[in-house]
Amino acid sequence: MSDGTLFIQDSRTSKQYTISVTSDTITAVDFQKITSPTGKLALYDPGLQNTIIKKTQITGRDPVTGITLFRGLSAKEIWNRHADFEDHFHLLVFGKYPSPEESEALRRRLAVQMTVVPETVIKAVQAFPRTSHPLPMIIAGLAAFISADPSSLPAIRGGNIYHGNRALCDEGVIRATAAYAVVMGLINSHRKQLPYVPADPQKSFYENVFAMMRCPVHHNYLVTFREGMVLNSDNGMTQSSVVLLSTASSLPDPISCLISAITAAYGPLHYGAQEAGSTTLKSIGSLDKVPEFLEQVKRRERRLFGFGHRLHKREDPRLASVKRWLKMMDYTPDQEPLLELAQEIDRLASSDEYFIKRNLRANADFYTHFLFKAWGFDWDMLCAANMFHRIIGLMAHWREAMDQPIKIFRATDLYVGPVVIQEDNRTVLEEPKIQSRL
């Protein structure tokens, strides 16, 4: 039973309150009914650990098995349909698995949009030194895409243009997705001093991506990349999804929202963990140094990225698939010595009491960066390459938000600083105060 009533008695005032419970949730503003002489009751939730910010039909979990469901379909069901990017994009973003005709129409729209390469975008990317990290180049390239079409900016148009306008939202998600692929292709060619490979209007999205990024176009590589897309396309309210939705709540264009999500994802506690993890592996150096590294982790002197997971408290259900894909591509320590180091860390940690007691196991991210390396991406491109999968979920959340009532994200904070400064320089601290909106 998930609906009911919460009965509350406030010991401060002896007042009693009733708050409705629906689907195991309560509405946060209902707590404002609970008052005292010092003010209304507020919820303190750093990091939004127990706060629901939106209703969604995109990604959920089977309550019995815990299997992730994408619009009600499991990854296995989607794999069995041999879904390509266009199929899964249509499912998550537009809400239904496409017919062959709908999939082809979307493929064509994406491919044609990918042939649009504004000169300002080329100049923005090429203005960077070839040794630059991809992140600032991506941000600059996407920003240049926005500048090439000022009509996409709501503020310039005089206000909201996307919220409630499904047709314009559909154009927006396609343009943002194509823009990301173009920018990545330009960055790759610029850094490697190679000619830019333009998109082919006759190819699928991932066929164009592999050509533009000069990835090995082998059958198993594309098969595993597409299967990886399904698992990696969305994982609910990740930090980058929350940031995207926070940005979207002020109703800007989708590329601006995408920029905010990408910037957030590059932090070492999110997708940046994969790049940070590969850097950590390189610093270990050799197999014989793995035991000492793990001891340093246990002493909190070093950080082990890719172990433990906020959602998956036991074995990460994605991990078996990641290992299967590495095997399908015959990717072994012979191709990448760091893989042997990772396997040794996994082996030793799995039998170490410290990690066992804390339920710290290798998650999919611990091995995923080897997948992207096998697919042909450079180590410092790992987070950026991940976005070729996750952009589906990000665009799905943006479009869904544009269909729902909008509340601009505006939290409050609890001020705990000085309140009164005495003339004799003594600081008097009163009780912490909830900030009124400035």
From Swiss-Prot:
* Pathway per the UniProt entry: Secondary metabolite biosynthesis
Q: Give UniProt keywords alphabetically.
A: Transferase
Active site per database record:
309, 365
For biological process, the GO terms are: carbohydrate metabolic process; tricarboxylic acid cycle
Cleavable signal peptide: none
Q: Which GO terms describe its molecular function?
A: citrate (Si)-synthase activity
Q: Top enzyme class of this protein?
A: transferase
GO CC, any one term: mitochondrial matrix
Report the biotech usage.
Phomoidrides A and B (also known as CP-225,917 and CP-263,114) are potent inhibitors of Ras farnesyltransferase and squalene synthase. CP-225,917 and CP-263,114 inhibit Ras farnesyl transferase from rat brain with IC(50) values of 6 uM and 20 uoM, respectively. CP-225,917 inhibits squalene synthase with an IC(50) value of 43 uM and CP-263,114 with an IC(50) of 160 uM.
Task: Write down the InterPro entries for this protein, in alphabetical order.
Answer: Citrate_synth-like_lrg_a-sub, Citrate_synth-like_sm_a-sub, Citrate_synthase, Citrate_synthase_sf
Reactions that this protein is recorded to catalyse: (2E,10E)-dode-2,10-dicenoyl-CoA + oxaloacetate + H2O = (4E,11E)-2-hydroxytrideca-4,11-dien-1,2,3-tricarboxylate + CoA + H(+)
List the Pfam families: Citrate_synt
Q: What is its EC number?
A: 2.3.3.-
Judging by the UniProt lineage, the source's domain of life is Eukaryota
User: Coiled-coil regions in this chain?
Assistant: none
The task this protein performs is described as:
Alkylcitrate synthase; part of the gene cluster that mediates the biosynthesis of the antihypercholesterolemic agents phomoidrides which are dimeric anhydrides. Within the pathway, the alkylcitrate synthase (ACS) tstJ and the alkylcitrate dehydratase (ACDH) tstI produce the decarboxylated monomeric anhydrides by coupling the C12-fatty acyl product from phiA with oxalacetic acid. The pathway begins with the highly reducing polyketide synthase tstA that catalyzes the formation of a C12-fatty acyl-ACP, starting from one acetate and 5 malonate units.
| Family under the similarity heading | Belongs to the citrate synthase family.
Query: What is this protein's record name?
Result: Alkylcitrate synthase tstJ
